[in-house]
């Protein structure tokens, strides 16, 4: 007899349309799209872009995911997985208006929204209210900034997810040139 394989339970799922990041600028939209996909490739562990692909982050009970490595004091002595990148030129990120990594805030906003709907404990101190994130409700807009000095601005402009459950969860990103689908499963 073959036992049924347990199916994953989807706790939340949302999609980010990569064709609508900057609707008024084709060039800007391409930069945002490229930087979003590159950030996901770093999570996957292979920064060479190729499509489509899947990237996953598994969080055990009590584990934390931080979008970038500069952490607030309350997270410094905990088990933390980070986005494995600094969103800088040396890692291949493209600039827009002089800022390398433009677009990763849109990815962080998708993560905030989906993780919140899944019941994860979310800490996002810097809202992206200075510019809308198309397709993401305003309350989940998340501003990300990495500074090498690790100062308070970079620690506050981070996204932290904590698994409050007594079971592990996975963030599963399915990415293509057109969209990023994120689901949180148990």
Report the location of each language-model feature:
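Well-ordered beta-sheet/strand-loop patches within structured domains
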Residues: 1-186
């Amino acid at each position: 007899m073959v036992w049924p394989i347990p199916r994953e339970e989807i706790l939340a799922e949302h999609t980010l349309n990569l064709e609508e990041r900057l609707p008024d600028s084709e060039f800007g939209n391409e930069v945002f799209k490229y930087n979003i996909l590159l950030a996901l490739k770093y999570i996957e562990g292979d920064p060479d872009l190729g499509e489509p692909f899947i990237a996953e982050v598994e969080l055990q009970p009590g584990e934390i995911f931080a979008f970038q490595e500069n952490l607030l004091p309350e997270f410094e002595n905990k088990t933390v997985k980070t986005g494995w990148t600094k969103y800088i030129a040396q890692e291949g990120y493209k600039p827009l208006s002089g800022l390398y990594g433009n677009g990763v805030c849109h990815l962080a906003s998708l993560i905030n929204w989906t993780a919140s709907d899944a019941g994860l404990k979310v800490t996002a101190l810097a809202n992206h209210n200075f510019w809308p994130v198309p397709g993401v409700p305003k309350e989940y807009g998340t501003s990300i900034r990495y500074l090498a000095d690790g100062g308070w601005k970079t620690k506050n402009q981070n996204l932290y997810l904590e698994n409050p459950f007594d079971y592990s969860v996975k963030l599963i990103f399915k990415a293509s040139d057109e969209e990023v689908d994120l689901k949180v499963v148990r």
